[in-house]
């Protein structure tokens, strides 16, 4: 089974390395191109390995209608009209050129979730390195096929999809390539920590026989993302906002630059502790015990509880040999407080 998926010259998904961090800009620009470009700058500055945007026009997702069926009935966007919500949140196609130009200048990797075939065409013009398929688009097999045919790595979010839908999607992509990363995701906005279901990462890994599993996290903090690191994910995605006080369509479950810095620091430390080996070092000998002479022991004298003791540091025979040498005899004179070695024993 492959252990790496190359993204570009500088990045790869690697099961032996720290999870890559994706900063999802989404609609946190509030319709301002200036803020949009600034979000890319700040995400890069905060340490995001990849920066993701969303490529669609409202007409790629819904119909302009004021009928009741086109209004959201619960959650964060309760009573919002679909068309108006996507109009507010979308990143205009005309902004993409400057976004990719900025990413190139910053030497960061910018990519996107396309929501239509024409969006894929636009992204191909900008030579994206990879794609993300949103969980709500996983059943749009025309879109899946269009993305798969680029033969670029695809990150698949699974939040709103059934196992059969995920499987059908994977089968289609595998006709073209196997550079697939599967994300565990809960499509609640925001997701409560008690509903994060982080253990599902292991289920997805086993179910789809993949090393390349990640997390798209919609909780309001970074705890779930840090916990996922211990389950050997290759990527973690968090929505990103310009500051703690920012107000936008996704701001409730987005993190600030300060939190992004913390996230990278914490997952780096967790990953470090997971891959570290408990190797013996010269330092620990000072905290281990070995056998010493309690008093001067004469040549041919027996070792007894009265003349040997286990003390620190470990310079001679390990303390575990204590009972084995009792009643054996010394080959030579051993001075008081000297360590006892194998060569000292008959």
Predicted regions located by residue number:
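Catalytic cores and adjacent flexible loops of soluble metabolic enzymes
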Residues: 1-346
């Amino acid at each position: 089974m492959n252990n790496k998926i190359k993204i570009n010259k500088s990045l790869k998904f690697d099961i032996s390395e720290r999870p890559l961090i994706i900063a999802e800009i989404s609609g946190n620009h509030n319709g301002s191109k200036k803020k949009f470009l600034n979000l890319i700058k700040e995400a890069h500055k905060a340490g995001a390995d990849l920066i993701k945007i969303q490529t669609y026009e409202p007409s790629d997702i819904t119909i302009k209608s004021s009928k009741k069926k086109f209004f959201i009935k619960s959650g964060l966007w309760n009573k919002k009209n679909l068309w108006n919500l996507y109009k507010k949140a979308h990143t205009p196609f005309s902004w993409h050129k400057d976004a990719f130009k900025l990413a190139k200048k910053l030497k960061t990797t910018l990519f996107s979730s396309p929501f239509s075939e024409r969006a894929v065409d636009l992204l191909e013009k900008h030579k994206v390195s990879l794609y993300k398929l949103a969980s709500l688009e996983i059943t749009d097999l025309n879109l899946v096929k269009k993305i798969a045919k680029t033969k670029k790595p695809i990150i698949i979010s699974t939040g709103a999809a059934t196992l059969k839908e995920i499987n059908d999607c994977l089968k289609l992509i595998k006709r073209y390539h196997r550079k697939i990363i599967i994300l565990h995701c809960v499509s609640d906005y925001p997701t409560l920590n008690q509903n994060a279901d982080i253990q599902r990462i292991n289920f997805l890994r086993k179910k789809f026989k993949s090393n390349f599993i990640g997390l798209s996290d919609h909780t309001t903090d970074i705890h779930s993302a840090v916990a996922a690191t211990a389950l050997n994910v290759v990527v973690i995605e968090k929505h990103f906002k310009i500051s703690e006080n920012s107000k936008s369509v996704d701001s409730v479950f987005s993190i600030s630059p300060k939190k992004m810095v913390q996230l990278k620091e914490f997952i780096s430390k967790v990953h470090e502790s997971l891959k570290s080996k408990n190797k013996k070092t010269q330092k620990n000998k000072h905290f281990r015990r070995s056998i010493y002479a309690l008093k001067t022991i004469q040549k041919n004298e027996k070792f007894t509880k009265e003349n040997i003791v286990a003390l620190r540091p470990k310079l001679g025979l390990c303390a575990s040999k204590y009972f084995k040498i009792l009643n054996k005899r010394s080959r030579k004179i051993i001075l008081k407080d000297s360590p006892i070695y194998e060569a000292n024993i008959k």
